[in-house]
Each structure stands twice: as C-alpha cells, then as structure tokens.
C-alpha cells in the first residue's frame, strides 16, 4: 500500500508539472503517443480524420524497423507513411511561442498542424523545426500530421535533384521518424533555436578562447541570437551562468543591455575568464552547463541551458594537438546509422553511450561518421564518453556541381549551426572523396561564418595537395604530411563473422571460404568470380590483418620525422546493415558484432591503441580460446605492446614468440593440452609488464542471463530498452567458447522482444529462438508504456534453464507531453582522466633534409620527389640509363633508413641499388605496400645519396583483395586503374623520399 501511495504521489507531481508550464521556457519530450500508418492517405492531414485503428508508437520509431539486419540494405522497404499525434498544451502556454523540433526524418516529409500545411523537409539527414504558434489551439486538442516518403530515389521537388547521400550502399533507409522530437514553449522575447533551413535561426553559441591548459583558465564566450515578437521595444539584459558537472555555479557574468525593436533579431554577447576549469578530453567527458538568460525590467523571461565542454586544439606540422598534447588519431569509420538488429538506428540515449563508450574502452579516440550528418543523440553521447568526432554533412563518393553541390553546402551549414556547441566534434568533413580547391574554400567560408571560434579543422577525404584544407587523408592508403594533418579515412575493409574462431574450432570454417562474388558498391550489381577471401575471415586471421594494417600507420607516427601520419580509422566498429562483400547479407568488418559483442580484433586494438601516440600502458591479449580436441596442434597468436612475450601452458614455458609488425607474436605448433594458457609480456629491461590467460572450459551445463541497462534504470516510455545477455557456462561458471546451442526465450510482462542476431535463416531477426555463438549472444527488449515487472526465461536442450526479472519505472505523460528528456540524466564519463601534461611521444628518428637533386631525366621535376605532395612525382624517361637520381643532403650524416613512396606502390617491386657517394649501402627489390616502404641501409657518413634502378621491376598487385567503393581515377599514382599500370619498362618513379637517422633509445 505504501508503494502504491508513493507511486500515486510521484505520478501526481509529474502530471502537475506538465499541466502548468511554470518556467520561463519549457522543453517537452514530444515522442509519446504517436500513431503510425504505412501507406498514403491524403486525408490523414485533416484534424477529424479517424486514426483510432493506427498503430500506437513511441518515437523514435522507423516504420520498417523489423527489417533491420533481416534484409540487405538495398532491399529495405521504401514507401509512403503517415505519423499523427494528438496533444494539448499545458495551462500557462497561451500567448507564448511554440516550436517543434524534429531531430531528423527520412526522407522527404510534409508537416501539418491542425490541418494547416506548415512546411517541407527533404534532405533526410538533419534536424528541422517549425513555428507552430499561428496554428496552435490553446486549451484544446491539437493534431500534428507528418507524411513521409522514404523512396530510395527521392528527388527534391523544386529542382528534381536526387540527394547524393540517399544511397543504397551506406545510408541504411530506416524510414519515417527514427529520431527524437521536442516541443519548445517560450516567451515572445526568446533565444532562437539552431534550426536554420526552415526557421532561419542560429540559436546559442558557446566557445572558449585564450585557453591555458596548465593553469586551467580560459575566457568563455556566450552568444545568443534573440528575437522580439512583441509589438514594442524591449530593453534586454543578457546574463550567463556556468555550472560544473555537479550542478555547482562557478561563474556568472553578463553583457551590455540592448534595446531590441519589435520583429527584430539581434545577437547578444557576454564573456568572462574562468579558472579552475576541467578541459574536455579523450576519455574524459567533462561537461558544463551554460545557462544564458534574457531579462527585462529585472524579470527573467527566457533561459536556455547548453551542455558543452571546453578544450584547446591545434592542427599543423602534420599533427593534431588536444589540450597542448599531440594525439594520433585511432578509431573507427562508423556508419551514421550506428544501427542494431530489429530496431535500426532508433535506440535510447544510454545505449548510444554504451556503444560509443565501447569505442573508448577499445582505446579509440576518434569516430568518423560516414557520409551523413550524425544523429544529435550520438553527437551528445560522444561528448559524454570522451570520443572525438569527425562530422560529415552529406555526400557520396564524388565531388559534385550544380544543385547537388548546393545541397551539400546547405546541409553543412545546418549541421554546423546545430552541432557547434558539442566539444567532441574536432573535424568537419566536406566529402568522402576529394573536392576541388574552390569547393574547399566555399566550405571553409561556411565554417568561418557559423563556427569561427570552435577550434575545429575543416577538410575532406584526400586533399593531399590543397593547402586550404585543414586536414585530409586517403582511403586504404598511408599518407604523411608536414603541413595539414593526414589521417586515413577508412582502412582494413576485411570482414569476419564472430562465430568463426579458426579452422580448428567448431564449425570448422575454412578461412576465407564463403563466396566468390559480391555486390559492387559502384553498380549495385553482383560481380562474379572475384576473390572474396578477405571478406570471409575467421577471427584469428581477421585479427592478424587488423594488426598488420594498423602497423602501417603506427610506423609513421609523430616522432618518426618531419613528415608523419596522424593515424587513421578502421572501417566500422560494429557490424552494419550496409554494403557488404562477404557471404552474409550485412557487413561484418566490425570489431564487435551488431549486438556489440567484441570479436578478437577489439582486444587487439585495445592493445595497440593504449596511448596518445606512443604506447603508455602495456597490454597483452591471446587470440582465440583454449578448447580443442586432444590431437590439435596449432599456432597461438598473441597481440602485445610488450618488448618480449613468453607463453606458458599449465605453468611450463613454451618459449618466446616470433615478433612481427611490432605487436604480433606467433608461437608455432603448440599442442593442445587442457588447462591454463598464459602469455606474459616483458619490457625492454626484462621485467614483466602485462599478462593474459585462457582457461579450458568444461562441457556446457547451464544458461546464464544478465542485463545491461541504463544507469538510471529502465523507463516504461515505449522506447527504452534493455540489452539481455545470454551465455552458456560449464558447471564452474566458465563460458563455453564452442557452444552454439539454440536458446528458446519467453517474455512475460509489459515489454516487447526485439531480439538479436545469429547466422541462419533471416539472421534470426525478431526470433525468440536464438542460438548463442561462441557461447554468448544478446537480445534487445523494449518497454511498453505500462510500467511493471518483466520475467524472461531461457531454455535449451541439455542445459539448465535460467530466469531473470526486471522492472520498468513509470514515465509521466500528460496530453502527449512529458518532462522526461532521455539523455539529460546521463553523466559524462571520466575514465581516462584529464589530459596528461607530459609529452605523448619521444622522437625516435630525425630527418636529414634534402637540399637539391640531380636526375638522369626530367631534371626540372626532381624536386617533386621531396615536395611533401603525394599527388606529384619524379620519374625518368623509361630508359635504364636514366633511371637514377642523386640527392644532396643538408649535412653529412650516417643515414640508416630510407623511407619512400614509390609510384604504383601496391603493384610494383622496384629492383634498386642505393649508394652513399660511391659506396653501395643497399641492393634488392622493394616490397609492395599500401604507401610507404622503409629500407634499412648501411650507415655511411655522406652528404650525397643516389637511388638507381638496376633492371625491370616485378609486377602484379600485392593487395588484390583491397578494393575501393568508388573507382580510383586512372591518373592516381597508385596506378591501380591506369592502363598497363603494372608495366614498368625501366621506369623509376618516386612520389616522396625521406632520409632518416634512428635515435637508438
């Protein structure tokens, strides 16, 4: 009885708060009590239209969520659907302004309020808002209706132009309203919303300048665009108050009073120095709340709370600084949909934190959202978890002209305005392919107009020779620079199903086996008789490939010379319902599966990425498991940042591993014996610095259930979810790594099973019969709008069953409105601590600069081989006697390493002789690469080095399974698409060359 009384009081209080708008400005959750109909009914815009038989939904909710991961991306349903909502405004709202904010709809949408047409939104990517004030009925029911068409080929009505980013390869088409909706009620003198396309307003802008990291000081600025919709002048005072993460006020300041005329829009500003600041950083999501308020005659009439953070950035010398510390980018290029099976992209805010937080746990510091502006929920999530973002606007694989380019600039403008207060965004990306210099200048001007003080670099993919770009980087290849930083926009496209450990484990999948065809991302047609082994990995080979590919960037890190790589992002973090090349109908390049269960490469990256540049915390991981048949003899792979790794089996040493690619240790021909397999890492002094182990599990005996949920509990709002984890364990509680049992689930209570994913018919989407894979799986369960206890049972043949109960808490909704704002209650994570004040790297190499060069041919182009421009080259005239070039160095030096990028790097091996003066210091054939090669040469004191071709080069693609989505141009220096690009005819072609001295530590 006592609990019932308490619940009644809480409900009454919540309803009372909604019933009477008492603050100067109210933001309501507008997600509840929508109605959905799939099909086109023009009369649905009318107020009196009968919608009682429509499906009741809580937003965010795409109409085709059931298809997520069941169908391949190009098969996702596109059609017309309607959403309707009945609502009333609280008492006290009369004579106020009312705005609606949709965080995004897909694709083209017509909006109606009380039967009146209020506008169109078509880009399918960004937020949109409308002023509802002229149409609202105060004290009466209002009806909002939205007609949405998510046609893959949707075209802008005014021009007939298709949006470039509405693409069947990368932009999963979860149609309808897959993002949140908010209702804002303000005074007639108010701070505008950052929604430009429809409202033509820019909102609040918070930024910091004169940042002094060591002394914890900065000058914090606040700017608010305000509008006066009274019919008389208003003398406005602008006040700012800054609160720390605990809600404590740390600074108040104000600007000068301003008279704003009727109908006028003005920008008010204020600034003050604040000390004792905590600066936002990687893995340190320290956020402040900045409240900006408008006062008239001593009375507060409007207030906006902006959650933001402060950090210092710098971009130059090929490097990136965050809070005065150099950081090499390491992370993931993630699909903007960031989707899950059975629900698509529409998950609660805490689950976004869980997913994005896993990237930080994996020691990633950057997520590059691909092709489309990320959802605001993901952007705010990255603020909280401390994950740097590269924010796209919208594009596909090529630069564009005309209306399609204008669409891109408009979307970039809107995205910058909407997201410029989010500290985790450090990069604005203008294209997934190189754009022209003129277009780069145009995009830069947009940034300078709307975010001149945000400390963000703007660039595009590639941009190797366009100095107006503030960053760049290719896809798949390795770039270096001593000007604007270069980081790889995508690398390592290989795929691997989590289910496949190795060839020695059930289900004994032969590595690479699966298909000899895949659907082209360029034509959407199936290409047959292709080598698809790289897209059907087992987890051991998938892990090795990930190690090899990261090594290419780590080797060129800051501290290795004047020209460096600023890192790169591996393509996708979690398996995705987008373009794929493997045998499954979704992409499995993720280091986790679609339910965010880690694969082995997750732990490999955790090892390789634990540091800002250099490794700061030694780690170790044994690849795979230790449950095999008694006669198995196999290699054991260990990923570690230690200087030496020793393997022990049941306490007996098996010796030290063979080290390759710096991080990979191989122990060949290890005979399986049940028990404990341990790997111990040692530092350069022989001291143990890290340890990992695998334990043989017994036979499967029991099912274990556990729940991952919001730290604030499960909400009965019809949209919140819990993540149910199921494991098969032995009698001692150890997970059985080879278990693939089919589990049957039953759910009792007010909740909806949305399920998980596994290999099989329809990928088991929505099925309550779901197998574990490698002993584990997960499923999503969504709340109803009725609170209560939910009981879940799991059964399987031959296993002890399991049961778990959990309760959902009420969320108060009155007349379609709620004060509960998902995400507001989630706190920033401070797991990695504040930015260290120590250097992030030690110099390991120094360059010996080139003064000049003399070449056997094309002398005037010799400088192009050392001009820090990877789109230029020197080459001879194709004759062997002219295939040489001699470099004069700035000083006499004992060069012991030569780093080169040779034209056709993935196709050609050049037979070279290298001389220091007249002395031969290296002879051999260069290896094929994805960019740079390193030759360890005999150190001889000299100020002159000659590179000479000694015969025709060997030809053939060394990376035949690595392909782009878009076709490279024939003029590109990898020669991949050039006619006869693998034919050399005594050519010597050098893109860049560097001479180095190693600083032996």
Where are these regions (language model features)?
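Beta-strand-rich binding/interaction modules
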Residues: 215-258, 634-653, 676-681, 740-743, ...
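Substrate-binding/catalytic cleft of secreted carbohydrate-active enzymes
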Residues: 298, 353-601, 605, 614-626, ...
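Accessory beta-strand-rich segments of carbohydrate-active enzymes
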Residues: 28, 40, 78-200, 388-390, ...
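Glycine/proline-rich low-complexity spacer/linker segments in large multi-domain proteins
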Residues: 118, 138, 143-185, 279-291, ...
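Beta-strand-rich structural segments
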Residues: 222-226, 293, 636-639, 680, ...
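Extended carbohydrate-recognition surfaces in non-catalytic/accessory domains of CAZymes
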Residues: 22-103, 158-170, 174-177, 185-189, ...
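Active-site-adjacent substrate/metal-binding segments within catalytic domains
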Residues: 61-89, 93-101, 106-114, 119-122, ...
């Amino acid at each position: 009885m006592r609990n019932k009384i308490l619940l009644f009081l809480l409900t009454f209080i919540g309803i009372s708060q909604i019933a009477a708008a008492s603050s100067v400005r109210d933001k309501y959750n507008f997600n509840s009590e929508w109605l959905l109909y799939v099909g086109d009914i023009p009369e649905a815009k009318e107020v009196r239209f009968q919608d009682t038989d429509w499906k009741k939904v809580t937003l965010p909710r795409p109409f085709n969520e059931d298809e997520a991961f069941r169908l391949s991306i190009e098969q996702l349903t596109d059609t017309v659907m309607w959403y309707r909502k009945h609502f009333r405004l609280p008492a006290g709202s009369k004579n106020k302004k009312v705005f609606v904010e949709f965080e995004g709809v897909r694709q083209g949408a017509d909006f109606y309020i009380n039967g009146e047409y209020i506008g169109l939104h078509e880009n399918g990517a960004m937020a949109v808002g409308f002023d509802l004030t002229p149409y609202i009925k105060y004290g009466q029911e209002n009806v909002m209706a939205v007609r949405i068409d998510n046609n893959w080929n949707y075209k802008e009505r005014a021009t007939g132009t298709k949006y470039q980013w509405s693409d069947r390869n990368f932009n999963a088409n979860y149609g309808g309203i897959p993002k949140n909706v908010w209702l804002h009620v303000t005074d007639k003198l108010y701070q505008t919303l950052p929604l430009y396309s429809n409202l033509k307003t820019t909102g609040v802008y918070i930024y910091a300048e004169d940042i002094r990291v060591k002394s914890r000081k900065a000058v914090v600025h606040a700017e608010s665009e305000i509008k006066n919709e009274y019919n008389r002048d208003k003398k406005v005072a602008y006040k700012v108050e800054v609160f720390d993460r605990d809600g404590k006020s740390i600074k108040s300041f104000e600007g000068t009073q301003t008279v704003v005329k009727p109908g006028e829009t003005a920008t008010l500003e204020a600034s003050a120095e604040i000390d004792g600041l905590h600066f936002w950083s990687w893995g340190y999501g320290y956020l402040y709340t900045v409240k900006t308020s408008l006062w008239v005659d001593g009375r507060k009439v409007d207030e906006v709370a902006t959650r933001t953070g402060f950090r210092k950035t710098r971009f130059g010398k090929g490097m990136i600084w965050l809070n005065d510390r150099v950081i090499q980018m390491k992370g993931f290029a993630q699909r903007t949909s960031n989707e899950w099976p059975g629900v698509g992209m529409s998950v609660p805010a805490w689950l976004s934190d869980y997913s994005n937080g896993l990237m930080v746990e994996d020691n990633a510091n950057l997520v590059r959202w691909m092709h489309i502006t990320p959802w605001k929920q993901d952007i705010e999530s990255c603020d909280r978890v401390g994950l740097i973002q590269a924010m796209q606007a919208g594009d596909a694989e090529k630069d564009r002209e005309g209306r399609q380019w204008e669409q891109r600039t408009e979307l970039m403008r809107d995205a910058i305005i909407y997201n410029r207060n989010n500290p985790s965004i450090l990069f604005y990306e203008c294209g997934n392919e190189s754009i022209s210099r003129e277009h780069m200048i145009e995009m830069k001007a947009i940034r300078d107009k709307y975010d001149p003080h945000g400390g963000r670099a703007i660039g595009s993919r590639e941009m190797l020779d366009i100095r107006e770009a503030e960053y760049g980087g290719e896809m798949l290849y390795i770039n270096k620079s001593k000007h604007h930083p270069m980081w790889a926009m995508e690398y390592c496209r290989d795929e691997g199903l989590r289910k496949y450990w190795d060839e020695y484990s059930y289900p004994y999948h032969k590595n690479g086996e699966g298909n000899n065809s895949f659907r082209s991302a360029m034509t959407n047609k199936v290409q047959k008789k292709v080598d698809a082994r790289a897209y059907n990995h087992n987890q051991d080979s998938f892990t090795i490939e990930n190690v090899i590919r990261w090594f290419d960037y780590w080797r060129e890190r800051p501290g290795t010379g004047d020209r460096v790589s600023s890192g790169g992002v591996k393509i996708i973090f979690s398996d995705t319902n987008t373009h794929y090349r493997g045998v499954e109908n979704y992409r499995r390049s993720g280091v986790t599966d679609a339910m965010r269960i880690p694969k082995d490469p997750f732990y490999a990256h955790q090892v390789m990425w634990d540091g800002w540049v250099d490794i700061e915390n030694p780690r170790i991981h044994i690849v795979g498991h230790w449950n095999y048949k008694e006669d198995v003899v196999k290699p054991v792979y260990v990923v570690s940042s230690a200087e030496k790794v020793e393997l022990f089996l049941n306490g007996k040493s098996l010796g030290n591993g063979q080290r390759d690619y710096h991080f990979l240790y191989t122990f060949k021909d290890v005979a399986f014996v049940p028990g404990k397999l341990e790997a111990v890492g040692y530092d350069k002094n022989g001291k143990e610095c890290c340890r990992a182990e695998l334990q043989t599990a017994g036979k499967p005996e029991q099912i274990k259930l556990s729940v991952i949920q919001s730290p604030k509990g499960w909400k009965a709002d019809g949209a919140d979810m819990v993540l149910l984890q199921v494991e098969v364990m032995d009698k001692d509680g150890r997970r059985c790594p080879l278990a693939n049992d089919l589990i049957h689930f039953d759910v009792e209570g007010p909740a909806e099973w949305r399920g998980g994913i596994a290999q099989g018919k329809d990928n088991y989407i929505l099925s309550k019969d779901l197998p574990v894979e490698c002993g584990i799986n997960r499923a999503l369960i969504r709340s109803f709008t009725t609170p209560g206890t939910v009981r879940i049972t799991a059964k399987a043949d031959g296993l002890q069953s399991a049961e778990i109960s959990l309760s959902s808490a009420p969320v108060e909704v009155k007349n379609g409105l709620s004060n509960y704002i998902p995400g507001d209650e989630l706190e920033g994570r401070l797991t990695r601590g504040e930015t260290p004040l120590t250097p992030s790297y030690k110099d390991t190499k120094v360059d010996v600069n080139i003064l000049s060069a003399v070449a056997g041919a094309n002398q005037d182009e010799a400088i192009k081989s050392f001009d820090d421009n990877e789109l230029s080259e020197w080459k001879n005239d194709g004759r062997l006697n002219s295939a040489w070039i001699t470099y004069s160095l700035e000083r006499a030096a004992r060069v012991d390493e030569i780093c080169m990028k040779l034209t056709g790097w993935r196709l050609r091996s050049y037979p070279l002789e290298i001389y220091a003066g007249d002395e031969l210091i290296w002879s051999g054939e260069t290896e094929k690469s994805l960019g740079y090669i390193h030759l360890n040469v005999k150190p001889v004191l000299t100020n002159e080095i000659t590179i000479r071709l000694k015969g025709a080069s060997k030809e053939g693609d060394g990376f035949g399974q690595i392909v782009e989505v878009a076709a490279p141009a024939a003029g590109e220096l990898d020669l991949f698409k050039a006619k006869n690009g693998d034919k050399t005819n005594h050519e010597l072609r050098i893109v860049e060359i560097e001479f180095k001295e190693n600083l032996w530590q």
